[in-house]
Curated annotation (Swiss-Prot):
Gene3D superfamilies: Aldolase class I (3.20.20.70). It comes from the Eukaryota. GO terms for biological process: carbohydrate metabolic process; defense response; hyaluronan catabolic process. It is found in: Secreted. Signal peptide: none annotated. This is Hyaluronidase A. PANTHER family: HYALURONIDASE.
Amino acid sequence: SERPKRVFNIYWNVPTFMCHQYDLYFDEVTNFNIKRNSKDDFQGDKIAIFYDPGEFPALLSLKDGKYKKRNGGVPQEGNITIHLQKFIENLDKIYPNRNFSGIGVIDFERWRPIFRQNWGNMKIHKNFSIDLVRNEHPTWNKKMIELEASKRFEKYARFFMEETLKLAKKTRKQADWGYYGYPYCFNMSPNNLVPECDVTAMHENDKMSWLFNNQNVLLPSVYVRQELTPDQRIGLVQGRVKEAVRISNNLKHSPKVLSYWWYVYQDETNTFLTETDVKKTFQEIVINGGDGIIIWGSSSDVNSLSKCKRLQDYLLTVLGPIAINVTEAVN
């Protein structure tokens, strides 16, 4: 199905309010056709990101390799009521306006609802889930145990993510809600150094319509790394935007695809993207059917006067001019 033609918007999701103490207000952002929250609030009228909101079950790492359980540790052991109550408290505290009509971003990255995808620092949730079943059924073989662990984990992971989204939508009806980073693609990773998404992940995305059907916006992350070649950086963006657009096209309501983009290299956060990388990654988002870009920044990008000045300079000389060119060309 053809995607609805939408205005291509670029959003500012950078905590530059931290620069106000140095009398740097970043008012120039809006001169470049970039949508910014009024007063440069971080959680504001245009966009609000909520980091690890509520009380999602999770195993939180402590210093000595140990971890502590939060709300049961894994979704199948968690208490949904506690979580949802805390979620609304967080929302009301951070952004009390019930008429919020911007983009609401839930940034939850402790585990993924697809059991297989919990690797790296998420793997403890997988191991913990397997241990729970093994303790219950000591005579079962490894395969049976893993299958059961996977089934339980995925059922309740879905429950937590879905109910959270529904509650967000119910209490902030006019906002466009989505989870940061989804759909995942796992391209340009050490085992998959190609633009195309991991095939298994694409099948798993197809099975996640329960999530995407409830989202008004898809928010793939297209942060690039310096260790990649310039062509690989473009490939990373291409594959991730394409996959999100593919998912959107398969849904009746064709949610918007807004790509999360960071102005520094993910593996070299003191280095701004080159002008060429900015141009090419922005173009790639447009070419592959994206509906916009969310420029993200970390608080550690703006926690000193010199960093604030550097970012402002970069905005005025590189990022801003490219942003206005792209929006004017597309719209």
